[in-house]
């Protein structure tokens, strides 16, 4: 088990430092999580050596019988997990999955209607700096002044735009997404409907958030975040024709050989998601996020939409004299890792922002519950109340490190 340590101590030393960082810091970036040693072990397996262009039973290389077996297992487990008919587990990331759907279902300059990035959307939902906003004509809907999606307004925009594809899903929206409403809107304007559930997939799998099926034509997700699997992407549908187009779009459309070792790890992760204890984890994720939101509101902070239904909390500082970047850096000094984030009504640049996004997945994976989240939320508020008090931040960091070391998740950097 010491091959890397003995062969390349310089690399191993960096690994050890990252392990120490992950152990000592309270990871509260909503898109990050701690995957299991079994998933990491699968990613470091002999499958990292195998090329397998194509799909099970239709490869361009020989010697793929076991690559076929592991990919078929991942597909079957994903189908069971999400209750769908067709799954492509080859996308290298959520962005690749979204790009694959667009290539499959759209032509250049077709219209996309997605959620505004500053209102909680994602780059790949048509942002002008992303390929999705360069290849296609992108239009946006957002949230109202209270931070909720206004479905009547979405319908009004859709009637004007007449998009070929509507994208529902977000990277910083703390409320339940009403897929049925989006289906009604899509049907009214004759659009296809895609759900990007990258952030909430683990909740959907556990029944803690409504499923996008049967309302959406196609569904994309990452396999990490709330699913706690390896970093990767996936596309799902119940439509055989769409599935065929998507398979061709992923390979040979935008990718060559799949990452078979990552697909193996996806299979392991899906196996974990199918276990009864997964439902308990997902439920605790929501409870912990709700605890966090309640404490912050009680401490006088503006939680966007007035709370949360999922794993994340979005805090706005539009009423404060400091920025999201200031808060991000101050909390980092206190041993709490969050990310600066744009908020509804944003007045600052995306590099500065007026808010932060805080998530519960990683600390819930470490075994923390309401008591710990109440304590941490109060420490977050203490930091924000004293945004420039570096000495206080360092004192709080000592307390947070002591707390973190009670919930150690890894005993070594590689598995």
Swiss-Prot record:
Compartments where found: Cytoplasm
A Pfam cross-reference name: SHMT
Reactions this protein catalyses: (6R)-5,10-methylene-5,6,7,8-tetrahydrofolate + glycine + H2O = (6S)-5,6,7,8-tetrahydrofolate + L-serine
Family: Belongs to the SHMT family.
Binding sites annotated in the UniProt record for (6S)-5,6,7,8-tetrahydrofolate: 117, 121-123, 349-351
SUPFAM superfamilies: PLP-dependent transferases
GO biological process terms, semicolon-separated: glycine biosynthetic process from serine; tetrahydrofolate interconversion
Gene3D superfamilies referenced in this protein's UniProt entry, alphabetically: Aspartate Aminotransferase, domain 1, Type I PLP-dependent aspartate aminotransferase-like (Major domain)
PROSITE patterns documented for this protein: SHMT
Necessary cofactors: pyridoxal 5'-phosphate
Name the UniProt record assigns to this protein: Serine hydroxymethyltransferase
Subunit structure, as described in the record: Homodimer.
Molecular functions (GO terms): glycine hydroxymethyltransferase activity; pyridoxal phosphate binding
Residues modified as N6-(pyridoxal phosphate)lysine: 225
Domain of life: Bacteria
Swiss-Prot/TrEMBL site (Plays an important role in substrate specificity) positions: 224
Protein purpose: Catalyzes the reversible interconversion of serine and glycine with tetrahydrofolate (THF) serving as the one-carbon carrier. This reaction serves as the major source of one-carbon groups required for the biosynthesis of purines, thymidylate, methionine, and other important biomolecules. Also exhibits THF-independent aldolase activity toward beta-hydroxyamino acids, producing glycine and aldehydes, via a retro-aldol mechanism.
């Amino acid at each position: 088990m010491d091959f890397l340590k003995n062969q390349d101590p310089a690399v191993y030393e960096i690994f050890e430092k990252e392990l120490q960082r992950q152990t000592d810091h309270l990871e509260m970036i909503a898109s990050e999580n701690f995957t299991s040693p079994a998933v990491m072990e699968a990613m470091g397996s002999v499958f990292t050596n195998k090329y397998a262009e194509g799909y099970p039973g239709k490869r361009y290389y020989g010697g793929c019988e076991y690559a076929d077996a592991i990919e078929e297992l991942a597909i079957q487990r994903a189908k069971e997990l999400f209750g769908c008919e067709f799954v492509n587990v080859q996308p290298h990331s959520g962005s690749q999955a979204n790009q694959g759907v667009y290539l499959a279902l759209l032509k250049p300059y077709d219209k996309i209607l997605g959620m505004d990035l500053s209102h909680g959307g994602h780059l790949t939902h048509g942002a002008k700096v992303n390929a999705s906003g360069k290849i296609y004509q992108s239009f946006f809907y957002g949230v109202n002044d209270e931070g909720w999606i206004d479905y009547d307004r979405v319908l009004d925009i859709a009637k004007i735009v007449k998009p070929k594809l509507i994208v529902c899903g977000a990277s910083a929206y703390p409320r339940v997404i009403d897929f049925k409403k989006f289906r009604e809107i899509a049907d009214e304007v004759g659009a296809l409907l895609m759900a990007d559930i990258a952030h909430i997939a683990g909740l959907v799998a556990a029944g803690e958030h409504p499923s996008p099926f049967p309302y959406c034509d196609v569904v994309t997700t990452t396999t990490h975040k709330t699913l706690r699997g390896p970093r990767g992407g996936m596309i799902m549908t119940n439509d055989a024709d769409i599935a065929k187009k998507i398979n061709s779009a992923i390979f040979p459309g935008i990718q060559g050989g799949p990452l078979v070792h990552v697909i193996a790890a996806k299979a392991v992760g899906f196996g974990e998601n199918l276990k009864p204890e997964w439902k308990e984890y997902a439920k605790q994720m929501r409870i912990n996020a709700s605890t966090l939101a309640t404490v912050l509101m009680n401490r006088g902070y503006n939680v966007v939409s007035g709370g949360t239904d999922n794993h994340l909390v979005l805090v706005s500082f539009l009423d404060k004299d400091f920025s999201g970047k200031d808060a991000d850096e101050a909390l980092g000094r206190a041993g709490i890792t969050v990310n600066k984030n744009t908020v509804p009504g944003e007045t600052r640049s995306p590099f500065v922002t007026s808010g932060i996004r805080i998530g519960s997945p990683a600390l819930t994976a470490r075994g923390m519950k309401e008591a710990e989240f109440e304590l941490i939320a109060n420490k977050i508020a203490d930091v924000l109340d004293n945004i420039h008090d570096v000495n206080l931040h360092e004192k709080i960091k000592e307390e947070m490190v002591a707390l973190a070391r009670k919930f150690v998740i890894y005993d070594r950097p590689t598995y």
